[in-house]
Amino acid sequence: MPRRRRIEPRKILPDPKFGSELLAKFINVLMVDGKKSIAESIVYGALETLSQRTGKEALEAFEIALENVRPTVEVKSRRVGGSTYQVPVEVRPTRRNALGMRWIVEAARKRGDKSMALRLANELSDASENKGAAVKKREDVHRMAEANKAFAHYRW
């Protein structure tokens, strides 16, 4: 049966150390098999390393890195007639954050450093300087949207 009213997104509790909902969401994205305490120790260790390296406050450095990875446009497949077009669409703010976090975690997991905390710190450091695999992923998505700008009128 269809829902009659729009469901409210679940309220997420802010993380215990910095009091940031964004960081709590990031910890949840990193978490594997429900092991939140391990995910928290990885993230806090990475932020500690990041703040020592950049000289900025940990949360501020994290937000800069995330801002550099967030996509503004993406492509969605749309079938028109017999062919499928990659139609560029703007990304909603919540999805923007979710994609940015997911890309940072994926890029950190693919790195070859010793510990996950170090990998995450290096990826966040690269992202804050507009380089690294996560930023490259965003550039690829933007390039794809730019290349398919001609199909923007198929937007729905």
UniProtKB/Swiss-Prot annotation:
UniProt KW Aminoacyl-tRNA synthetase keyword: no
GO cellular component terms listed in the entry, alphabetical order: small ribosomal subunit
Keyword rRNA-binding included in the entry's annotation: yes
Alphabetized UniProt keyword annotations: Ribonucleoprotein, Ribosomal protein, RNA-binding, rRNA-binding, tRNA-binding
GO biological process terms held by the UniProt record: translation
SUPFAM superfamilies: Ribosomal protein S7
PANTHER family: RIBOSOMAL PROTEIN S7 (PTHR11205)
Family that this chain belongs to: Belongs to the universal ribosomal protein uS7 family.
Subunit relationships: Part of the 30S ribosomal subunit. Contacts proteins S9 and S11.
Protein name: Small ribosomal subunit protein uS7
Organism, scientific name: Histophilus somni (strain 2336) (Haemophilus somnus)
Source organism phylogeny: Bacteria, Pseudomonadati, Pseudomonadota, Gammaproteobacteria, Pasteurellales
Gene, per the UniProt record: rpsG
